[in-house]
Curated annotation (Swiss-Prot):
Domain Cadherin span(s) in chain numbering: 33-124, 125-241, 242-353, 368-480, 481-586, 586-695, 695-807, 809-927, 929-1051
Membrane topology according to the record: Single-pass type I membrane protein
Protein's recorded name: Cadherin-related family member 2
Biased amino acid composition, Basic and acidic residues: 1255-1266
Record-level Gene Ontology MF annotations: calcium ion binding; cell adhesion molecule binding
Domain-level remarks: The cadherin 1 domain is required for binding to CDHR5.
InterPro entries noted in UniProt: Cadherin-like_dom, Cadherin-like_sf, Cadherin_CS
Organism whose genome encodes this protein: Mus musculus (Mouse)
Cytoplasmic side of membrane: 1174-1308
């Protein structure tokens, strides 16, 4: 009990000590913390700080889903980062922090905010980085657009774009593009496929605008991307000629079509290389030359060098090169160049004579003369020229071709000479006295000679006749001491130069005739000299005209005249002394084209000097003016032959000269002083492709796989040839995998070219397939040797990831399967390929397409085939395969790789396996249903005429579906059932759109008198190439209509009228009978045979089932159709009869009349007797009338409207309308009880006898109308019938009576 008191005493103290231990608490700043996302793992993130009023030791902890980010020191509260933070993934999160003093635990929720840092680089979002643009794209156009994204925020996420590098890197291309803030790449300058580059690669980089990272400012940039830009060449440039000038020579006698030279032009648009054609657009001599489309200039007309003397013997033609297609401006792209063609001389002219004086001759061919007149004194001294003769000989040819010989012919040729005897070009011709004794006026007053000019080369000649008139002289005349004075004078001497003062004449007559005066007779240059009349001194009158090169010797006649006018003459031979006054003249121009290396220069400089031949003044010496390349040539100083001393090398010539070596040849004479002429000889050393392009190194490049269009690297080559045609370097790639790359060539300068190696825009390299590409780059130019140089290029593929499988195209080749269970099991196998080494491939069926004749037929073939996972194709339902249901089965398959890495396409493209279903002859032909009834009217059907037809099809194809028809059996079945075979039919075949038609034709005429049906069995059989043929039969019934159904219709109109109304008649007959009307004949009737009918028509009326109408049936049907009957009557129908109805002859007509009279007489007697008997039997008639009344009350009223009478009869077209011919259907009790009853009467033979009847009877009581006059008592039977019809309308009563117009005809 004591311990209980002790416990009660200590319990309050214990409670006080427990309640005094307070729990720890966190500070107010422990609810939120901000940490940068770039805080390194392991760094102190923050401290957990708590306080405990009891100063107990505290421990710390962190819990919750995000506690893994941190690690905490439980004793110190230091919190370190355990996992990296990422603002872009988790921008903020919560953790639970806790502290404990060992007894109490305090928790709190802390918000951790992650602060963004610039830790992300921009990433391009584009999937493709290639494009193509036209070279004419306007400046400022957007070429391509890129987009990059930066996941950071603020300025760190603001993306800017930069163009780091442009390949090729030139001053022009570096500024060719610019990129906008939105990523649009804009063209900054003009493009040119030919003058700049055809391909560009832009290295782009995207950078953010900067931010803080690791406590420092940081700007992040993306990995570079490469944008490939292909420039598409546009036709914007004109063509250009390969050479800067063209020249050639051709002989003037060249035939039409002779090739002169070839010009060549190329399209300046290298990427298009359009076809260039050539034409002559202008010419100094139109029509002389033309050009073919391939650039060959040829002779197109007759040439004549002599017409070109004023044009330096050259023809200029303007050649225009035109591209085949229009340029981008819609205009022709063309360029022009003048071509020089020198026409060389041939000896095509003979010398001619002209009546003129040099140098004033025009030498027009029309002015050539053949007759000349001259004068000379008799006994003139030898070598005295004929005065008054102005003859010039001229040959327009050049050089030796223009040299000719002069001679004399004729009866007086011995008396004269011609001077000169040899000349070239043009010369004044003088005829001089040779034998003065023969020149005797007393013997001949007129002498004739022929001057012959003969071509020195061709022996062509011309003849001129000179008529010389002799002058008579006196015997005493002045006499010169010499008959010929040989004088000399320098050419071009001063005017007044004294030639001689030694010539004197004496006159034997003394002074009788006065002093002697001297004068020069005109002609042959006499106007160039003058003589002093008194002294005889000879001086030069005009020294400037004395030119030895034009005329070396002048033959003048000096006349001495005495006072008696007697005169004498002497010959003056004045020879001009040559001075060196003419420099050498070089013929033509010299442009030589020679290929380098093996080409040889061999050209002779042709020159001449007009100074005196065989003197130093005309002796020419050739020399070369020293120059840069003159040492490579030799020039013969005497002949002017220029040769090269060794092989010429185009590459040794300054490229600026473009292969042209201009040599200056000095042509000098040896006179005093020496005169010279310079001529330039242009030797164009034509470049040949004798230098190979060379590379300066081998190349190693690397490229990432799966990056299409990536730039790989650049190779360079150099060609020493100088012309663009020969140093144009084209690059080509060879080696395994070369087709994955494209090498874009770009011409640099001075024979250098570079090739940019790119991946094709649509090619993605695969590291697993090929890690290295060992390529060979070939540099070649279009030389005939076909040689090239190469460089090794190694491309290393850097690995990224892989490719989808592909289907083997060979395994998808179309196969054929025969229908209807002909084949089973596997028919083919689809093979798939995958360049990946770990590929696990399967084949799956994607779709099945069933088509027949190109038309989709749905799912009819879906179960026929199956595809196994290994690609094996099996037949599932062999028996179900049916060609007639489906012609072509298309299995759409694809391959997939089970081991494809995520993110890559595991499926191949769909492939189509075509399975052609081969037809088997499994379908017999079948006849198409034919509801037509075939009817034969033998009288109307002729041989070779179609009487029936069948149509058949065969669902098989080709030969299996071709149908042939045959008649297996044909028999005639009579109406009594008997039959017999016939051979009267044949069958022909036609086909249209797969439908075969068999036409059954008659072979011979049919018998029109027999009745029955032809049964024809037709067989359709196909024509298979393999296996048995299949056939089908059908039997046709051909109904015959014999002559018993022939009906004759008589008309009141003529045969012609019936024929004209035939269509209306047939239409009315068809309307009434509903049959087909077959007209046999239409004939006129003898006018004496009938009273009304004028013509008849025989016809058949046949139903569609093969039956025909008889005469009776036709009558009934026509009577029933009132509209048709009315129309036929209007068209003249009179009688319908059988064919046997013939017109009676006169004898028969007479017999008929007699018989008719006898019958009429008997009839009259019978009527009289009958009337008497009826009077006696009136009582019996009364009884019968009463009985008839009773019967009439039992019979319904039938009011029959009057109908039209049938023409030619006493019958009406209504049933029971003819009481005489038709028996009543109801017995009214009027018949006699026995055949011997004398009181028997017909219904239309009622008399007027009255019968005592009860008129008050209800049945017979008449209702009188007011005002009606009294009527006589009716005949008893009439009253009975009238009473029965009481109540009918008045119109009905009126219609009970009619008049029969048929009684008007004579046909009774």
């Amino acid at each position: 009990m004591a311990w209980l008191w002790l416990l009660c005493a200590l319990l309050p103290a214990f409670m006080v000590s427990v309640t005094a231990n307070s729990p720890p608490s966190f500070g107010v700043n422990m609810t939120l913390v901000t940490l940068p996302e770039d805080l390194p793992v392991g760094a102190v993130a923050f401290w957990l700080v708590a306080t405990d009023s009891d100063n107990d030791h505290l421990t710390y902890g962190i819990s919750g889903p995000n506690a893994s980010y941190f690690s905490v020191n439980a004793n110190t509260g230091e919190v370190k980062l355990a996992s990296p933070l990422d603002f872009e993934t988790v921008p903020f999160f919560k953790i639970t922090i806790s502290t404990s003093d060992g007894l109490n635990i305090r928790t709190a929720e802390m918000q951790v905010i992650v602060e963004d840092r610039n830790d992300n680089i921009p990433v391009f979002l584009n999937t493709e980085f290639s494009t193509s643009i036209n070279e004419t794209l306007p400046v400022g156009s957007v070429v391509f657009s890129v987009l990059a994204e930066d996941k950071d925020t603020g300025t760190a996420g603001l993306v800017q774009y930069f163009i780091e590098k442009v390949i090729p890197s030139t001053a022009n291309s570096n500024n060719l593009f610019r990129i906008l803030e939105n990523g649009s790449i804009v063209l900054n300058d003009t493009l040119s496929y030919n003058n700049k580059s055809a391909f560009y690669q832009l290295e782009l980089k995207a950078c953010d605008s900067g931010g803080i990272l690791d406590n420092k400012p940081k700007t992040q940039c993306s990995q570079p991307v490469f944008v490939s830009i292909s420039v598409i060449d546009e036709p914007d440039l004109d063509p250009r000629f390969i050479r800067e000038f063209y020249s050639a020579s051709v002989a003037e006698d060249a035939t039409l079509g002779t090739s002169v030279l070839t010009v060549e032009a190329v399209d300046s648009d290298k990427g298009i290389n359009d076809i260039v054609t050539y034409s002559v657009s202008n010419s100094t001599r139109p029509g002389w030359f033309d050009i073919r489309e391939d650039g060959v200039i040829f002779v197109n007309g007759s040439l004549d060098r002599e017409q070109l003397l004023l044009e330096n013997e050259e023809v200029q033609i303007q050649v225009t090169a035109t591209e085949k297609n229009l340029n981008i401006y819609g205009q022709e792209a063309k360029a022009s160049m003048w071509v020089t063609i020198r026409v060389t001389d041939v000896n095509d002219h003979k010398p001619e004579f002209y009546n003129c004086s040099l140098p004033g001759c025009s030498f027009s061919p029309q002015e050539a003369q053949v007759n000349f007149i001259g004068y000379v004194d008799e006994h003139a001294s030898a070598r005295i020229s004929i005065d008054g003769l102005t003859m010039v000989a001229y040959d327009p040819d050049q050089g030796d071709n223009g040299t000719f010989l002069l001679s004399l012919n004729g009866q007086d040729a011995e008396a004269f000479n011609v001077s000169p005897e040899r000349a070239a070009g043009s010369v004044s011709v003088q005829v001089v006295v040779r034998n003065s004794e023969m020149v005797d006026y007393e013997k001949e007053t007129v002498m004739v000679v022929e001057v012959v000019a003969t071509d020195s080369v061709s022996n062509n000649y011309s003849v001129a006749t000179v008529t010389i008139h002799l002058r008579n002289i006196n015997d005493h005349r002045p006499v010169f001491s010499q008959s010929l004075y040989e004088l000399t004078v320098p050419e071009h001497c001063p005017t007044g130069y004294l030639v001689t003062d030694k010539i004197q004449a004496t006159d034997l007559d003394g002074d009788e005739w006065g002093p002697i005066t001297y004068s020069l007779l005109p002609g042959n240059g006499a106007d160039l000299f003058e003589v002093e009349p008194n002294s005889g001194n000879l001086t030069v009158k005009n020294g400037t005209l004395l030119d030895r090169e034009k005329q070396a010797v002048y033959y003048l006649t000096l006349q001495a005249t005495d006072g008696g006018n007697q005169s004498t003459t002497t010959a003056l031979e004045i020879t001009l002394l040559d001075i060196n006054d003419n420099p050498p003249v070089v013929r033509g121009s010299y442009n030589v084209f020679v290929p380098e290396e093996n080409g040889n220069v061999s050209v002779t400089i042709q020159a001449y000097d007009d100074d005196q031949p065989d003197t130093n003044n005309s002796l020419l010496v050739f020399s070369l003016l020293p120059g840069p390349y003159s040492s490579n040539f030799s020039l013969d100083p005497n002949t002017g032959l220029l040769r090269n001393l060794g092989p010429l090398d185009r590459e040794a010539i300054d490229p600026a000269l473009e292969g042209r070596i201009v040599l200056t040849v000095i042509v000098a004479d040896c006179g005093e002083p020496s005169l010279s002429t310079n001529v330039n000889v242009t030797i164009t050393v034509e470049d040949i492709n004798d230098n190979l392009p060379v590379f300066n190194q081998s190349y190693e490049f690397s490229v990432w796989e799966r990056v299409p269009g990536a730039w790989v690297g650049t190779v360079k080559a150099w060609d020493a040839d100088q012309t663009a045609a020969n140093n144009r370097i084209s690059f080509s790639l060879s080696g395994t995998g070369a087709n994955n790359f494209i090498l874009q060539g770009n011409v640099l300068e001075q024979g250098w070219a570079e090739g940019s190696l790119w991946l094709l825009p649509d090619v993605r390299l695969d590291y697993e397939t090929q890690k290295f590409f060992h390529l060979t780059v070939s540099a070649e130019n279009p030389g005939p040797q076909g040689l090239d140089s190469t460089a090794n290029v190694t491309v290393t593929v850097m690995d990224v990831n892989d490719e989808p499988p592909t289907l083997d195209a060979a395994s998808l080749q179309a196969i054929s399967v025969t229908e209807n269970g002909s084949e089973h099991g596997q028919v083919t196998r689809v093979i798939a390929q995958d360049v990946d080494t770990a590929a696990l491939l399967r084949i799956e069926l994607v779709d099945v397409i069933c088509t027949k004749a190109g038309v989709d037929v749905g799912s009819v073939c879906h179960g026929w085939f199956s595809v196994d996972g290994n690609g094996s194709v099996y037949i599932n339902q062999s028996e179900a395969i049916d060609y007639e249901a489906c012609h072509l089965v298309t299995l759409v398959v694809r391959a997939y790789d089970l081991n494809t890495d995520p993110g890559f396409d595991a499926y191949s493209s769909n492939g189509s396996l075509l399975i052609n279903i081969k037809d088997k002859n499994d379908n017999a032909p079948y006849f198409l249903p034919n509801n037509q009834t075939f009817v034969i009217i033998p009288e109307l059907v002729l041989p070779n005429q179609q009487v029936a037809s069948v149509q058949a099809r065969d669902e098989d194809s080709e030969d299996n579906g071709i149908i042939m028809f045959s008649i297996l059996k044909a028999e005639f079945v009579r109406k009594d059932g008997t039959s017999n075979p016939v051979q009267v039919f044949r069958i022909t075949r036609s086909v249209e759109a797969g439908l075969f038609t068999g036409s059954i034709e008659l072979v011979t005429n049919l018998d029109s008198t027999i009745q029955g049906t032809y049964q024809v069995t037709v067989q359709a059989q196909d024509q298979p190439t393999l296996g048995p043929a299949l056939e089908t039969q059908t039997t046709l019934n051909l109904f015959t209509v014999d002559q018993s159904y022939r009906v004759r219709l008589q008309f009141s109109t003529s045969k012609e009228d019936v024929g004209a109304n035939m269509e209306e008649i047939k239409e009315a007959l068809i309307q009434a009978t509903r049959t087909s009307v077959y007209v046999v004949t239409i004939q006129n009737i003898d006018s004496t045979a009938r009273a009304r009918a004028s013509s008849y028509m025989d016809a058949y009326f046949v139903f569609s089932n093969g039956t025909a109408l008889t005469l009776t049936e036709l009558n009934m049907m026509i009577r029933k159709d009132q509209d048709a009957l009315r129309q036929l009557l209007q068209l003249g129908l009179v009688v319908v009869s059988s064919q046997e109805s013939q017109e009676p002859d006169q004898q028969k007509l007479l017999t008929s009349v007699i018989i008719g009279l006898v019958v009429s007489l008997v009839l009259v007697l019978v009527i009289l007797i009958t009337a008497l008997v009826c009077l006696r039997k009136s009582y019996h008639r009364k009884l019968r009338a009463m009985k008839a009344g009773k019967e009439a009350r039992k019979t319904p009223i039938e009011t029959t409207a009057p109908t039209a009478a049938i023409p030619g009869t006493n019958m009406y077209n209504t049933d029971r309308a003819n009481p005489v011919l038709d028996l009543p259907t109801k017995d009214l009790g009027l018949e006699c009880h026995s055949s011997s009853d004398l009181d028997y009467d017909s219904l239309n033979s009622l008399d007027e006898n009255s019968v005592d009847l009860d008129m008050d009877s209800k049945e017979f009581k008449r209702k009188d109308l007011p005002g009606d006059p009294p009527e006589p008592d009716p005949e008893p039977l009439t009253a009975v019938l009238s009473g029965r019809s009481a109540g009918a309308s008045e119109q009905q009563k009126k219609n009970l009576s009619f008049t029969n117009p048929g009684l008007d005809t004579t046909d009774l």
